[in-house]
Amino acid sequence: MFAVEMKFEVPVCTSCGKEITPREHATHFVCPNCGEAIIWRCESCRVLSVPYKCPKCGWEGP
């Protein structure tokens, strides 16, 4: 039998830096300004409208 090793990157909220769990009602989208970076938002930051900043272009959103 073969052992299979799977590696994946856990998404992190762009606003607070918290790891996003699979059961959380989070969202992700492409930066509306540059279209290059993926912005992740955890449920808490979405509900509280915590600002976020694009890691590529620095654009800030609500």
From Swiss-Prot:
GO molecular function: zinc ion binding
Subunit structure: Crystallized in association with 70S ribosomes.
InterPro entries: HVO_2753-like (IPR044720), HVO_2753-like_ZBP (IPR011668)
Residues that bind Zn(2+) 1: 13, 16, 42, 45
Keywords assigned: Metal-binding, Zinc, Zinc-finger
Range of residues in the leader sequence: none
PANTHER family documented for this protein: SMALL ZINC FINGER PROTEIN HVO-2753-LIKE ZINC-BINDING POCKET DOMAIN-CONTAINING PROTEIN, ZINC-RIBBON RNA-BINDING PROTEIN INVOLVED IN TRANSLATION-RELATED
Cofactor annotation comment: Binds 2 zinc ions per subunit.
Name recorded for this polypeptide: Double zinc ribbon protein TK0111
Pfam family, one: HVO_2753_ZBP
Required cofactor(s): Zn(2+)
Record-listed Zn(2+) 2 binding positions: 31, 34, 54, 57
